[in-house]
Amino acid sequence: MKTDENHLYRCRKSDFYSKTPRGSCAIALPREEIEVALVDINERRLSYITRIAQRIFAENGIPIERITATTDRRAVLGGSQYIFISILVGDIEAIRKDIEIPLRYGVDQCIGDTIGPGGIFRALRTAPVILDICRDIAELCPEAFVFNYTNPMSILCWVVKEVHPSLRFYSLCHSVQHTAKQIAEYMGWPLEDLEYWVAGINHQAWFLELRLRGRDVYPLLREKAWDPEIAEKDTTRVEMLKHLGYFVTESSGHNSEYNPWFRKRPDLLQRFTPGVGWNGETGFILKLYGKDRESYEQELERIASGAEPLSYEESEEYGMKIIYALEGGGIFRANINLPNRGTITNLPPQCIVEVPCFVEKGRIRPAFVGDLPLQLAALNRMVVQSQEMAVRGILEKCRDYIYYALYYDPLTAAVLSLDEIKRMVDDMFEAEREYLPNEWYHS
């Protein structure tokens, strides 16, 4: 298997604040004491990120000796308190298979990293590696807080909690923050004055409440949905707002894959996924991952060498703010992915939900949400039931459950018959053999 694995942070008695150079990965800058270990099996990539981290430390008066870089995670996991996981298993060719094989059958995906054929096969590739990492964490630093940024977030988190239920494993995404910023821009509101309460599942959470300086402004957003200029910018989410009454997280192109309404016919694709990129372009993920690697590495070299200035701005990502709160820096509220266990009362208790959580010294407490509006819970449950069968298939190495997961996937089921889905899955298993564990091929 081919994997990129990076960013393990180890810290003690630290006072953190978060800075983001050029929108890249957030690095915590300590005022007292911190040790940072960076892990990547790609030595070239590890060299770049290590030099960038050293530059950030040096520019902020932090001894660079506190940074360790290694390709061996077990060498640095012992004593770790906070761990970030961001990996990719397989290369651009694996992702190409995720997109192009379903497309031959008529299943048109924009990103394909969350559910659907692409998301589920990404999970099949990624889950064994995540479980290996978590096995080492359970052995070497079982009390660590583990924050996963890897997709498909919900499936991976669910798999880990089934195998390591006591591990403090959480998944973090930025779709809530990004959506809040987009809403503020659409409406001309100051983001700092916007208050919101969001809950659901990853990439399909719902803005349940929306207030501006304490005033309910959801009626204004619903009215704005009929503005053609806004609808053109955010097609599928605005259409769902019109019909379901609530705004959903994640971009319109990504969102279009998680339901049966927008990508099942050419005329619907033309209507609801116009333009390019995140608004629903077919196979857009291949452009994202297929960028000119030489130019990308040249940019990393310019940053690492100091040829390009670093602009320090507060990160949108939750990670460092969560650590700050866990270290006693006050209470911080963030939307975090974790097992439901009654937080959302009309979703299954074992599923992974994305809900408001209160982070304070030494612990993370999910807020009680209660019932989602029925029309929202119904769509979440469609996705959750597919996730659950994918999780069962991964844990049991049972291909039947992968068939079932895609039989009930909202987009796939809207396009294909049962026998077509089965043939597609078999084609994907055969095409991705080099990326998957041998157990999938023994039956």
Regions found by a protein language model. Give the residues of each.
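Conserved beta-strand elements of the Class I
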Residues: E5-H7
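Histidine-anchored nucleotide/phosphate-binding helix
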Residues: Y17-L29
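Glycine-rich phosphate-binding loop and adjoining beta1-alpha1-beta2 segment
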Residues: I27-I62
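Short acidic low-complexity segments
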Residues: R66-L77
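An anion/phosphate-binding loop that grips the pyrophosphate of nucleotide cofactors and donors
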Residues: S80
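Rossmann-fold NAD(P)-binding glycine/threonine-rich loop
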Residues: V89-H164
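Rossmann-fold dinucleotide-binding core
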Residues: F145-G214
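Long, compositionally biased stretches enriched for glycine and/or charged residues
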Residues: G188-S443
